[in-house]
Structures are given as structure tokens and as C-alpha cells.
């Protein structure tokens, strides 16, 4: 294991960026493979200062919200980080939002200004018009290397005060697949604390460089690949979007030492027959959804890169659990041990469950959200009476302190009174050589209450039918857990984090 210096402790993004700029003004912080341009630590600090003065001149002040509707790129990172460093609240909007969600988020967030790019301008203007909002829209390119000009309405604007650690910094809306999106409000301290946790957990230092292919409008992409490198003084290689054919080329050309992916990316990389991993990549971290053990083992065997499985959520500013960096201590199938958080499992009686017993995982820690924006009732429901965040994940802890996820409480299949974790069925199907992806759901059944339907994405050129999959599941799962029906689809619906949206599948069940 490579030794690294313990990361310094900061409590605001403004302080963090200022220190790195003074320390390494000319060192590249972010490299853009699409444009070939590099953003240095010094330029990031300068741009943050310029942005703060521009916001003040435009009549915007600390704590007010600015929305960013852009794909990944240098400009996107500059606007997100610079806005938070100025003391304003940034609202990165998911590009997968449907028109009704976009309308809701722009109105609910109390946004005062929107940054977008040419391809997104029409959607933003239409959403603002339908919401009855008169908000300035600034159009820029995701990979632009200079700030867009803001409208100046105040001649003698005072400089914005530096943000305090507990000041709100990020307003990020959940995907809202089961109802109205919820705005997760995270503070300066929340974000920097978890950037520090990531750096410490993976022993990262100034020589490390991450390939960042996850969207910055998702908490994983923002905290793990944009904020953590600020903490440890490393750098980021940020293509505009993920491409299986370019993934390893970008890693090799820019000397990446670690990777940050979701299970979907691992599946695509395994399905690409031409991919070859370069030397120099120390590890790959996988997060945001459970990594099937078969894919975990296959990735390590083929590419020779160890996978660190982690787990987090928007409400915890990304990771809350991580497997150790030391390969000998990692456990395939486990989300690891608490990382920067305290965790326990609660039984049905609301009391801590013994090791090995499944219950709801709850969390406390410095990275846990301040609450949901303008939703005090929902915020109260999200916490236990003594202040533990309810994750909604079912799981258990083993005797060595490692945690395992069984599924989501809302996604649990209850067949004839028997609780069945969908993930168990998914993993059995993934052990079939022709299956690329799978997701099981429970559907209403007059006899059992619920029956099991499995949605399956087959590998290219694979030949398989219902009978073959049923025979496979009978061997792997037994008759009771074998799906009643198999439905073949081109792709599974996923949120920006890569999680399968099972409840969307239910709409088609």
C-alpha cells in the first residue's frame, strides 16, 4: 500500500481553494481531453474571486441559489466550485430531468440565475416560462476556458463575505422517480468533510490523478472527483461523457492513478472486447449502486485493477462506507466499513440489531445533510428521534464491522409473507453467461400478494429464452425465488448515479 500524507483539515471550499492556489498556482487541477485545456489551481481561485465580484455586481448575495444545467467540462466545474466558494448555493440540475421535474426544481429552488449550454437553452427557457419565472439565463460552453459575463445591475457592489462552515453550499435534488424531487441541502462543512474522508480512505496525495466520467450533477461525481482532489492536491481528467472506447485511452494518455465508476460502467467495460487497462492505475472505486460480485471478480481478473466497493447517498455528501485500500482486507459483496460516519442497523423495533440480522441502516456524521430544502416535515421523517439518518437501505453488519446491503426497504419483494431481496435474484441471473444486466421486481399477485418478474438485458450475440433462464434460476435460487416471468429489454432505467430505477420498471410490469 502506498503511503500518503494525512490530508489537511479545512471546513470551507473557499479556504481550500485559496490554500491550494497559494501552494501550487501553476499546477493543473483539471484537464479536459475534449478541449486539451487545463485549469490550474491558481486560475480556479482567480475565477472564483471574479465570479464573486460578478455575482455582487449582479445583485446576488450569500445564500442565494444559482442553477447550473450543463454536462461535464471545465466551465461546469469552474461554475460549480466557484459559486460555492463565493458563499452562494449552487444547484446542479440533472440533465435527465423530465420537463415537469425541471419546472419544479427551478421554482422550488428559488434560483436567481441559470447557467446552461446551447443544447439546454430551449428546455430551460421553456421551463422558466411555464413556471412563470423571470430569471436570467446565461449560455456558455461546458468546456469554455473563461467565465461568461454576468449582467451588472449594481455599480458599487461590496465584496461578498467568505462563507462560514455551516453555510449552505449545495442544493441537489434527488431523482424523484417515486414522487416529487427532494432538495438535499449540504453545507460547506459537509462537502469538505467528505472530500477529506475520500482522500484519507484511499490514501490519496498530490501525485494522484482521477479519471472522472460521472456527471458533476450527481453527488458522487462532484464530491469524489471534483472536491476530493482539492483536498489532497491531486488532479482530475474530465471528459464530457463516458465512452467505453475512450476510457482506457484517456486513462493512459493522462497518467491516471485511480478510477471512479459505477457498476454500469464496469459492465460496459467488461462488454468491450478491445479494452486494455494501462499500467499505473492503483485502484478503481465503485459506488452509487451494489456491484454484482461476478462483475467485481471479472473486472479484477481481466484488467488487473483492484476494485474498492463503497456506498453513499446524496444526503451524506457521497460515500458513507468504503472497503479498505489494502486488497487483503476488502470483502467482495460488502459496502465496507463506515467511512467518516457512524453506522448501525435498526431492527423492526427501532433498536440496534445484533450482527448478522437484517434491518435498516442508519447514519450519523459530519457529512450528513442539514436537511431537505423547504421540507421540515420530510426532514423530520428522514431522521430517527435521536438524530440518525434513515438510509432506506436494508442490510446487516458482520462480526468484523463490515456492512452488506440486502436491498431497498421500498423495493423488497414480499411473496407469500416471505421477504425476498431483489438483489439476490439479480445476482443469480448475472451468473448466466448470456446476461449483461438484470433487475427483479415484485408485481401484484392474487395468490401470493406479490410475484417476481425479472427484466433482463442480454449480451450481444447471446442466444437465450425464458426456458433457459428459468432452468438457470431453478438451479441457483430454487423454485420459490425463481421469477414467474422474464422480460427482455434493451436497457434498464437508471438514475444519474447508475442505480437501477426498479420502481420505473413497475410502471411497465
Curated annotation (Swiss-Prot):
GO terms for cellular component: cytoplasm. It is found in: Cytoplasm. Its EC number is 6.2.1.-. One of its GO terms (biological process) is fatty acid metabolic process. InterPro entries: AMP-bd_C (IPR025110), AMP-bd_C_sf (IPR045851), AMP-binding_CS (IPR020845), AMP-dep_synth/lig_dom (IPR000873), ANL_N_sf (IPR042099), Pcs60-like (IPR045310). Keywords: ATP-binding, Cytoplasm, Ligase, Nucleotide-binding. Induction: Induced by sulfoacetate. It comes from the Bacteria. Gene3D superfamilies: 3.30.300.30, N-terminal domain of ligase-like. Residues 320-340 are annotated as: Disordered. It catalyses: sulfoacetate + ATP + CoA = sulfoacetyl-CoA + AMP + diphosphate. One of its GO terms (molecular function) is medium-chain fatty acid-CoA ligase activity. It is an enzyme of class 6 (ligase). The keyword Disulfide bond does not apply. Disruption phenotype: Mutants do not grow with sulfoacetate, but can use acetate, taurine, isethionate and sulfoacetaldehyde. Involved in the degradation of sulfoacetate, a widespread natural product. Catalyzes the CoA- and ATP-dependent conversion of sulfoacetate to sulfoacetyl-CoA and AMP. PANTHER family: ACYL-COA SYNTHETASE, MEDIUM-CHAIN ACYL-COA LIGASE ACSF2, MITOCHONDRIAL. Belongs to the ATP-dependent AMP-binding enzyme family. This is Sulfoacetate--CoA ligase. It comes from Cupriavidus necator (strain ATCC 17699 / DSM 428 / KCTC 22496 / NCIMB 10442 / H16 / Stanier 337) (Ralstonia eutropha). The gene is sauT.
